[in-house]
């Protein structure tokens, strides 16, 4: 068995932090029937082919085409992913976890891949600056949208296409790779009519669950990250998640602990705090997954219910010890903490002995001779201890190292846990009704035909009296 991601629940138990804020054996017995039910439901849905996302680790059909397309990408100086939300966060997490943070600054002969950029927002300053740094004529664009109609991504594409048409003319289509629905939507039509290379997103896999499809696997391959390693890591986690017992199934345990702390202990906020810069974007990916899947006020049938959901927050160790930790230790005890520990780093950097004056006199003489990894580990342990000492529940997710294989495990672990949590809350983890109205209003504001009533609502909103403005 290759290096496994494990979860340590010691710091969430009542015996560690007290019965008021920790889980007791009685609490665990209280939720155990629900966990058994959820595990059985997931297994049954998988047998009936209704949870396509959990079968993705065994889907390998696209890998040869992905590898071929990745080789062709190396004819470009730059690779830009146009996408937002689930269409971008997974790829960004892969880039950040598996490559040097300064990949784009490395000499061209040492990179082994194009310079990599992710264009998510429609801030005009950002896109304009990106096109100046990465001119379209030197760039391959991966346009990613499950629906094929995402307004932000399509708007970016229209800007980029205009620049490409001006700079490379009839070869503009060669600068695009599309990832979208296999049969429908504007992007699928565009790919078919212009002969643009494309990949399909499985119809049963929603955008925020799509990182183990070509949405994440193609950008990974372009970056020189082996998609097979991501899938193999996910497959190993899949095997571990087939057990119906929460003490053996890490994703079921993760879902159960989060649910129990929210419903039984009033912890409506969950903080993910990795102690590795390379996992910063993974934490952002998790935040979208958890928030958009679980924050609901309807049941799976679409009927109204009391609102539920746990607010995810990203922190980064050791940086946020110097910004957020004060609140976490002395502020309201309404949070569950997930500290992500990495036990082997790719680089070894020793703190050397020094002749700088005052080091020993100022009480810093104990620092030389240690590694930066030792310091980061010491800071992580200190944070755990301070939180536990203030009766804050802390679970620890342990990674042997940050690699494509361990990242594949993490993606699958949290996707499975999110689906299970949705079932515990009795909500549909795959829809997002709360964001649909905003999409309609956005299109109306931009002049979509047939949206005149919505457009009038927007005009009324913008023209409302501002008597409470502070000038």
Regions found by a protein language model. Give the residues of each.
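Glycine-rich phosphate/diphosphate-binding loops that line cofactor/substrate pockets in enzymes
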Residues: 45-46, 65-77, 130-139, 257-268, ...
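Active-site phosphate/pyrophosphate-binding segments
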Residues: 167-338, 343-346, 434-471
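Helicase-primase coupling helices
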Residues: 307, 313-403
